[in-house]
Curated annotation (Swiss-Prot):
Listed cofactors: [4Fe-4S] cluster
Protein name per the record: Homoaconitase, mitochondrial
Pathway(s) it belongs to: Amino-acid biosynthesis; L-lysine biosynthesis via AAA pathway; L-alpha-aminoadipate from 2-oxoglutarate: step 3/5
Binding site for [4Fe-4S] cluster: 335, 395, 398
Enzyme Commission designation: 4.2.1.36
Biological processes, Gene Ontology terms: lysine biosynthetic process via aminoadipic acid
Pfam families, sorted: Aconitase, Aconitase_C
Keywords: Amino-acid biosynthesis, Iron, Iron-sulfur, Lyase, Lysine biosynthesis, Metal-binding, Mitochondrion, Transit peptide
Subcellular location: Mitochondrion
Amino acid sequence: MRLHLHRFISTSTPLRSGQNLTEKIVQKYAVNLPPNKLVHTGDYVTIKPAHCMSHDNSWPVATKFMGLGAKRVKDNRQIVCTLDHDVQNKTEKNLAKYANIERFAKEQGIDFYPAGRGIGHQIMIEEGYAFPLNLTVASDSHSNTYGGVGSLGTPIVRTDAASIWATVQTWWQIPPVAKVELKGNLQNGVTGKDIIVALCGVFNNDEVLNHAIEFVGDGVENLPIDYRLTIANMTTEWGALSGLFPIDDKLIEFYEGRLQKLGPNHPRINKDTIEALRRGSLASDEDAKYAKHLVIDLNTLSPYVSGPNSVKVSNPLSKLSQDNIAINKAYLVSCTNSRLSDIQAAADVLKGHKVHPNVEFYVAAASSLVQQDAEAAGAWQTIIDAGAKPLPAGCGPCIGLGTGLLKDGEVGISATNRNFKGRMGSKDALAYLASPEVVAASAVLGKIGAPEEIDGKPVNASPEIVKSIDLPKSSGNTGATSEEPISEDDTSEASVEVLPGFPKSIQGELILCNADNINTDGIYPGKYTYQDDISREQMAEVCMENYDPEFKTKTKSDDIIISGYNFGTGSSREQAATCILARGMKLVVAGSFGNIFSRNSINNALLTLEIPELIEKLRVKYDGVNELTIRTGWFLKWDVTKALVTVADLDGEVILQQKVGELGTNLQDIIVKGGLEGWVKSELQKEQ
């Protein structure tokens, strides 16, 4: 069970009375809640999302769905399938996969959008599946995009998607919520992309890792919806699980414009749904709690560029322009910045100019509808006349697929969202991220540069960004620590119902793996990932092998791993969770976890706890000790009935005692059933 320190709040205290906007939307889509239960950060809830989108991974989801014994999608109006990732791939194998997805969607009556229609996230916005104040999920990390229109969008893994297809629901733990205040107004030439690139660069110490974000402040009201979508989209790269903007007049105007294009009979964007937004919108309570409060002054922001090869590195364009960084390729593609306003902005820069002879410039619209609008406006032809190479609407180079990838030694600048090493081609290439305007200007200049440089004008120096971060002690989000004694009421009264078959307590010796960012390959080596015939005993033997070959000789059944921050980062391999279970370990504790690992853990019946203070205490105790795996002699007991964790040494002296969030019966049921797949099978059997 994934619980941050700020989640350590007794559910009976008045501190939990107010709800923020994220919690209120989850409240709407949570099912099977106890009477009068208000949901808050840290709570595990069963959710029935308004919609669930999958893309090229729809066939693996369908295969898992059928493997569970499911025959029919329970609510075909909930599900959307789009083909967008590998649309340039015309091989027999890929076309067969696409045909399988289309056939399955037709048989099930699922809304289906074929290759060429556009990127799934853009379609979800255009067609109103992701709509203000609803909860929409997708088996893709950039589901955060939906927050740009006030829809709580968050990613799920394939097992979750199969569960939703079969039962209409899955589970979610409400993350800590960070308030990000945008103050002031953007200067001319500064865009939404500059906001999020700057945020990723100036708050680059995982301040919002695994948080939900709510954007507030007077700076929000003047941001176009396309800017909001760009910002929400890249909250993924910032480390967040969602990025939610408020409902305001500008958003309602956006939907009125969509209504004019779609006509009066659209099932999701129509007069009734827009009028419902006008009549009353959800908003955070005055006493809502936030884990932290970040502020950035938009008046002090200038055009920013991310990279190379990291979103945590960002610099003012004025600095990089002086460095004369030659480029080989430029990209105006992706769900981040290929909407009509982006294409028009690039066209305005390119008009009357030609792409530099040493540069290849690729352009793809976010959807076929966007391309049609860009063609009608003349912007598309302007970009093509300048020398850009058109690609079909889809993900393409952003995901490292198809034409125009970066080669060894090349430098690229892109309006996309990720510039990780090797993401857009060769691992020996350098990738930068910037706004459509800067990408277009760089394509003309042959180097990273600003639009004004095309006309021979100097680039103005950038002011220092004014920013701040606050961790409010009075908010109740810091929870109870060992320096803040637990009350007698907290420790004596059992308040959590425990299902038959679920343990009332979990305990074991803490085994310290003293490192941050232990990735899934360190937990379960990649060379074993596709050995489908490997036994459970063999999985136990190789558990943590790449992290420490001695792990298997130092640990035993019922031990509890305690590690640093971002444990389980990396790939989506489920064996990273199941190999720990194979060793007889039921619980992992860490400072924080990679989100996909957290979901895979619960989905496979492995419990997790986030207790940052505990890892910090152990790091003090073992400072200077170079062993990778240490038996600490500290024992953790998690009393599930009291939602209380106690850590004591061999002599019984209490080292730490923490009140933790309640593990509800919904999650207990998944664990008892052996994971999410087992739970789904049991639900399907009930319907037979």
